Amino acid sequence: MRYSEGGFFNAIMSFPQDYPNNPPTVRFTTDMWHPNVYPDGRVCISILHTPGDDPNGYEKASERWSPVHTVETIMISIISMLSSPNDESPANIDAAKEWREDRDGFKKHVKKIVRKSID
């Protein structure tokens, strides 16, 4: 289910001074409607959480940031997240609720954002 397929979504990846010891942050600068993207565009996936950081209390240390990760592994994780949302620990509660309860409504919402991204 790739509802966002065909869209062009701009994002900023910011690297801390102590990279690769700490993860970069990723924030979409275009509109997004996704359970794992905060309303302000910040991406919430395990690979971007520091080893000691477990904001939701469910992540294994092996799922979080490690200096062996690269920009490529981050991008692959984000692409995977876009097609397979994790609604167990949502960053956007409303998007997660719609994803769970009204899949057709979610699809329409995302398709509208995809159309907007290519205009």
In which residue ranges do the predicted regions lie?
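N-terminal onset of structured domains
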Residues: 1-10, 17-19
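Short, well-ordered beta-strand segments enriched in hydrophobic/aromatic residues
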Residues: 11-13, 78
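Short glycine-rich, polar/acidic loop-and-turn segments at beta strand-coil junctions
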Residues: 13-17, 30-32
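Domain-scale recognition of soluble eukaryotic interaction modules
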Residues: 23-119
